[in-house]
């Protein structure tokens, strides 16, 4: 849902305190056709920046936005030289100088079957031949399951479906001045019964999670930090600089260990799917051992394997 323009998140010095430093980034090749998302790679580090690019509507998403978001995140997932994804929103709004990470689904094109493809921004431009979508949930799962650390940089509004996206990210850094958190689902007859609510309760506890959803109040970055849903609060102009510092520290560590750690943290809440992801990475580790090589080679050479050099650890 688009947050009210008159509420906090507006900046009178929006351009001068923009946390995006163009000199630190280059556009990723092959994505020149993006309209609702921007996709950059850091000039030095193994970090990419993915940003919502509809600041005039508080970075609300439509189906086309989600298509592009999934496409770039999946590209980052499959890029072996990428370790960290920074997920944020471009701004400020050209209308009023307001800032937003993402304010959720664009209610103007929400139909009975979900958010609908449209040639414009109003109900009369909807393509009735195409079914509505709720595939922002697929993006949530992609963020959750991708073997990269995803850091959400909340530089303004995180509302509705945007609030749920911040929740599902591995880490969240927020702008001291402009970050505002608001779960608007119940205001518009919607609800996130998955990660957006259940995982939020893991972060802040059941009581605070229910407060956030049932009351739909607006919270500052400091309040969410105190609750446990935000890792750190930064000055707005320094938000992406701090995000890059965190990313550099993460990228300085073992890629395999970071993957195993992410899936280990997810395992308890993700059930059999979480077990499969963790086990898959464990299998990859096993393939790297001499013991696994012996098993493969013995099969290909049609001989009994010789396990004698390999200890049975306890």
UniProtKB/Swiss-Prot annotation:
GO terms for cellular component: plasma membrane. It is an enzyme of class 4 (lyase). Changing residue 192 to N: Loss of DHNA-CoA synthase activity. Keywords: Lyase, Menaquinone biosynthesis. The record marks 115, 185, 287 as: Important for catalysis. Converts o-succinylbenzoyl-CoA (OSB-CoA) to 1,4-dihydroxy-2-naphthoyl-CoA (DHNA-CoA). This is 1,4-dihydroxy-2-naphthoyl-CoA synthase. The gene is menB.
């Amino acid at each position: 849902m688009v947050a009210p323009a008159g509420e906090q998140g507006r900046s009178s010095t929006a351009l001068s305190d923009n946390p995006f430093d163009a000199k630190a980034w280059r556009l990723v090749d092959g994505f020149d056709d993006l309209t609702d998302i921007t996709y950059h790679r850091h000039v030095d580090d193994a970090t990419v920046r993915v940003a919502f690019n509809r600041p005039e509507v508080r970075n609300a998403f439509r189906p086309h936005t989600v298509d592009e978001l999934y496409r770039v995140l999946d590209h980052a997932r499959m890029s072996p030289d990428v370790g960290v994804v920074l997920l944020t929103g471009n701004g400020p709004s050209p209308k009023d100088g307001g800032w937003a990470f993402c304010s959720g689904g664009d209610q103007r094109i929400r139909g009975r079957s979900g958010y609908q493809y449209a040639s414009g921004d109003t109900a009369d431009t909807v393509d009735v031949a195409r079914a509505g979508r709720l595939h922002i949930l697929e993006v949530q799962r992609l963020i959750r399951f991708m073997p990269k650390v995803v850091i959400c940089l909340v530089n303004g509004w995180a509302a509705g479906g945007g609030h749920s996206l911040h929740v599902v990210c591995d880490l969240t850094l927020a702008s001291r001045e402009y970050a505002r958190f608001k779960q608007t689902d119940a205001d518009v007859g919607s609800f996130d019964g998955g990660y957006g609510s259940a995982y939020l309760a893991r972060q802040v506890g059941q009581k605070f999670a229910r407060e956030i959803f049932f009351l739909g109040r607006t919270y500052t970055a400091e309040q969410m930090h105190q609750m446990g849903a935000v890792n750190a609060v930064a000055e707005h102009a320094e938000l992406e600089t701090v995000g890059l510092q965190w990313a550099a520290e993460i990228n300085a560590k073992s890629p395999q260990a970071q993957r195993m750690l992410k899936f280990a943290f997810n395992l308890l809440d993700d059930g059999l799917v979480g077990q499969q992801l963790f086990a898959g990475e464990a299998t990859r580790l096993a393939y790297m051992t001499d013991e696994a090589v012996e098993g493969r080679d013995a099969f290909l050479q049609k001989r009994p394997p010789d396990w004698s050099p390999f200890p049975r650890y306890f």
